[in-house]
Amino acid sequence: DIKKISKVPLDAHLMIVNPQNHIDDFAKAGVDMISVHFENNIHLHKLIMQIKSHNIKAGVVLNPHTRVENIEPIIDYIDNILIMSVNPGFGGQKFIESSIEKIKKAKKLIGDRNIFLSVDGGINLNTCDKVIEAGANFLVSGSAIIDSEDKKEVINKLKGNK
């Protein structure tokens, strides 16, 4: 159980084929949320219910080409929408500008529901403000932090502590 060594909330972003075969293992490992890709799941509602059966949060990941409207039928069952603002697979990619409109659409779909709106891909000091302004309340940043000389400073700036 990972909770024995970390108090940080953990989201397992399953960018894999057949995530249903791995949900139970991640739940047993002690993650707080499991996020699965919309595009990989024919039976998305069933998969979300499988995640929720472990009393953990469920998130849905949308790749750049996937429309926000596609998750409308399951919006009341999820705890997080993760907008991929790059094509998944490798770090260091440039932020896809059309993601801003997608974030705004997702924020509107969420309405007053208690759902996180996360964005992953190309998040750096040049993109974080516009992503937050569009409605995101959780940012995932890899390369901007890893490749920086002063990681703590970059993290603080991404958090808005300038």
Task: Annotate each PLM feature.
Residues 1-12, 50-59, 99-121, 157-162:
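Alpha-helix-loop-beta-strand connector modules within alpha/beta enzyme cores
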Residues 1-50:
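N-terminal active-site wall of soluble small-molecule enzyme domains
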Residues 20-28, 66-77, 123-139:
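Catalytic cores of alpha/beta
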Residues 26, 81, 106, 120, ...:
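Conserved, mostly hydrophobic/aromatic
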